[in-house]
Amino acid sequence: MSEQGTHINKETRGFQSEVKQLLHLMIHSLYSNKEIFLRELISNASDAADKLRFRALSQPDLFENDADIGVKLSFNAEAGTLTVSDNGIGMNRDDVIEHLGTIAKSGTKDFFSKLSNDESKDSQLIGQFGVGFYSSFIVAKSVTVNTRAAGEAADKGVSWTSEGEGDYTVEDINKTTRGTDIILHLRDDEAEFLNEHRLRDIIGKYSDHIGIPVHILVTENDDEGKPTGSKWEQINKAQALWTRNKSEITEEEYKEFYNHVSHDFAEPLTWSHNRVEGTQDYTSLLYVPSKAPWDMNNRDSKHGLKLYVQRVFIMDDAQQFMPSYLRFMRGLIDSNDLPLNVSREILQDNKVTQALRKASTKRALTMLDRMAKNDAEKYQTFWTEFGQVLKEGPAEDFSNREKIANLLRFSSTHNDTADQTVSVADYVSRMKEGQEKIYFLTADSFTAAKNSPHLEQFRAKGLEVILMHDRIDEWLMSQLPEFDGKPFQAITKADLDLSKFENEEDKEKQKEAAEEFKSVVERAKGYLGTRVKDVRTTFKLHDTPAVVVTDENEMGTQMAKLLAAAGHDAPEVQYIFEINPEHGLVKQMANEADEETFGRWVELLLGQAMLAERGSLEDPSQYVAAVNKLLTKV
């Protein structure tokens, strides 16, 4: 506890605007789960203990002759206060202002833009964001924080006070002990947290697994029940959960530990706890979350596993142990092979790190594969939340490309819904006799994909096509040439050959029709010039007069859009214009003797094909003029 003398250097400061917004939303959105404030405060105390132990490896004087680190809870029913104290790393004045007056997270404004004023939805988002210390204001009308950083003089203590409104007060104090005391002045209707049994229940529920002892101040009574004094009593096991035998750990304990390491309110989808001995000696505890964090799509946001070395905390967000496409994984690695003075720089090119990364990646992919096979509904939840991120995998991790491909899910003409439930293995199991390729189509949306004219011949021949409508899909497929020995084939390519699924009579008729249509093709080429790479006849269409396609090695439409959206200069796509000789509009164009009118027909059909392929035209006015002039002749 703090010992305060004269209050000096006192100032009142305004909260960062995001803090005010978070406090307001949190108090209203999380009230139904208000007991989590104690979990958050004890979790912070545990982190402070971890940081002290780590820094004391190189600066043992930071222990100040007190290496027994722990958390203490005490309450005063008359005063209506609950105090959570720790003797961890503590804070100086700058730390207090930075950590208690602002939210030092990148993308904070983006996070708040996603809030909807729907309390149930916002509570999930706030839980993902991590409320930490601010959760105190769910139950407290005011909060005082007295703290001193380890290694600082007693007169370097700091006191921070706020009612959780627009501002806070910070001042210097004397504090003989290092660490932090958080004094909650509880609201009048929160007396339940001034009860020893209630506090014991909460600690048992949320904090049994942390690696430092939690003590509560209990009253001692004589034989007649009269109070004679008080003592500190430990109320948690204080053994790090991952060091215990798996058979002794309950499912509920694993879930609560996930909440502790991730600061996520939701339950994990699955987890894997492993002790490995041999060439490598380490323990890993990995979790797959059920909800994506608000900044999941930001590759630069902090992510990674907690790293311990010989049960000593080293760092949060150790990105070196998991590839970026698995950045949603949570948990920890405790290694006996890394040095205690390991730094992020040392981790970069360390052989032990590389071996641990390979093993943890394999473990994570195995967890996902097991979930996909054993619980399709749960895996679908995972895919909805994290599928976009997993699609980065084939480009990033060549050695595991086949495993990742097996975990991907897509829409398909087989089920004709936007739900991404079809695996590539599902598709392969339904391939027609003689089919050697996996056919796919990329588009801006599922609606655009399922209505694409490129699908007409596939539907007619009973061939399934994977429908891809996520922004990343074109890039994904450029990194995924095959699956199980079968090549992927984009159906928008000019050299697509489905002749093996046609009879000889049809082939002969098409050959004759193409020959008869040569002159029309040449006229169209002459009109369009270099606006297209080529003009050809096609017999793969049924209800559509024309399409545009690209050569096999030519950049496709979706890739060009992806590069443009990312700010890159993309070469212009060289389209091949394919016309259907059997369609009424094409026949009408072919019979047009007037070259000017013929040109308008070409503009009409090319414009339609470009709209179907790209969703837009470079020169809409030219297309509209051609349509209008043709309509005046009707």
From Swiss-Prot:
SUPFAM superfamilies per record: ATPase domain of HSP90 chaperone/DNA topoisomerase II/histidine kinase, HSP90 C-terminal domain, Ribosomal protein S5 domain 2-like
Organism domain of life: Bacteria
PROSITE patterns from the UniProt entry: HSP90
Tagged with keyword ATP-binding: yes
Ranges for region A: 1-344
Species whose genome carries this gene: Photobacterium profundum (strain SS9)
Region (C): 562-634
Location of the region described as B in the Swiss-Prot/TrEMBL record: 345-561
Gene Ontology MF term list: ATP binding; ATP hydrolysis activity; ATP-dependent protein folding chaperone; unfolded protein binding
CDD domains in the cross-refs: HATPase_Hsp90-like
Function, as annotated: Molecular chaperone. Has ATPase activity.
Similarity field: Belongs to the heat shock protein 90 family.
Compartment(s) of residence: Cytoplasm
Family annotation (NCBIfam families): PRK05218.1
Subunit organization: Homodimer.
One Gene Ontology term, aspect cellular component: cytoplasm
Protein name stated in the entry: Chaperone protein HtpG
InterPro entries named among the record's database cross-references: HATPase_C_sf, Heat_shock_protein_90_CS, HSP90_C, Hsp90_fam, Hsp90_N, Ribosomal_Su5_D2-typ_SF
Keywords per UniProt: ATP-binding, Chaperone, Cytoplasm, Nucleotide-binding, Stress response
Listed Pfam families: HATPase_c_3, HSP90
